[in-house]
């Protein structure tokens, strides 16, 4: 029942990303500075504005976990950690690898209530990114339709959004993106 600092939480999440505590220097005298550096490098500290050594407030613990879900996993290869496969493509994120989650970024073209239901349907078009892969001239993504969305995101219609989902009928979040 001890409280956990943001630094300690970040260390646990780095191990979840694939870092070996010994090889990565997350133990011993310099563990704290190495943890801070790797957590920052992997985006775990984005929007985390709290002391790293004091007890971590819930909102920042949740932010650390959210950031980790979207962070690419790492592997040890050629005497260094990398977040890419041997073929040069990005490793899966924690969300993709362990939870079957997907992300897509595009324009919410439509959002409406489903007939006779308390849920909504949404069309995502002009998809620019899917599971950390950027769309290119030769690699375009098909539009996506999501169903059974429990929350009303009508206010985000016609905006660029990021969707966190599992399958097309399990949407966990829709977030506005800065243009």
Model-derived regions: residue spans:
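N-terminal propeptides
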Residues: 1-140, 144-178
């Amino acid at each position: 029942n001890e409280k956990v600092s943001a630094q300690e939480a970040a260390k646990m999440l780095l191990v979840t990303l694939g870092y070996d505590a010994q090889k990565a220097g997350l133990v011993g005298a310099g563990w704290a500075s190495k943890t801070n550096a790797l957590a920052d490098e992997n985006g775990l500290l984005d929007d985390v504005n709290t002391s790293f050594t004091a007890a971590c407030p819930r909102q920042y613990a949740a932010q650390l976990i959210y950031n980790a879900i979207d962070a690419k996993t790492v592997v040890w290869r050629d005497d260094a950690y990398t977040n890419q496969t041997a073929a040069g493509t990005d490793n899966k994120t924690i969300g993709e690898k362990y939870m079957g989650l997907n992300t897509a970024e595009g324009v919410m073209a439509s959002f409406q209530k489903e007939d006779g239901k308390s849920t909504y349907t949404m069309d995502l078009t002009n998809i620019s990114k899917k599971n950390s892969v950027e769309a290119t001239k030769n690699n375009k993504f098909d539009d996506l339709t999501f169903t059974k969305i429990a929350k009303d995101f009508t206010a985000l219609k016609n905006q660029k959004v990021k969707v966190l989902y599992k399958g097309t009928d399990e949407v966990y979040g829709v977030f506005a993106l800065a243009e």
